[in-house]
């Protein structure tokens, strides 16, 4: 997993697949893949990712880069690396 701890929280690198049947997180080798229901129009996918990860992790989530790309970097505020890894692995099954 591409996760780095910073003084602000945890930076998470993900690959996004839009237009899925439901929102889900999958661990694919060393990569985290997030399947989103929304279409990649007018930031809908970005909003869905931030909203769903915030609910899942109970933390503030911000998009750092990848606003128009499938490769994204997210900041999860006030979180530890091990906590985020654990929750993501549980979700990824």
Give the label of every model feature segment.
Residues 1-50, 62-68, 72-93:
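Contiguous, often N-terminal, cationic amphipathic patches that form binding interfaces
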Residues 54-59:
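Beta-rich strand-turn-strand
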């Amino acid at each position: 997993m591409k996760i780095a701890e910073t003084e602000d929280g945890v930076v998470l690198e993900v690959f996004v697949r839009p237009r899925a049947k439901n929102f889900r997180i999958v661990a694919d080798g060393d990569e985290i893949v997030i399947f989103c229901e929304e279409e990649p129009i007018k930031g809908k996918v970005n909003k869905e990712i931030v909203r769903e990860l915030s609910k899942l992790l109970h933390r503030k989530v911000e998009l750092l880069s990848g606003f128009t790309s499938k490769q994204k970097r997210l900041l999860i505020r006030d979180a530890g690396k091990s906590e985020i890894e654990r929750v993501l692995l549980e979700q990824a099954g």
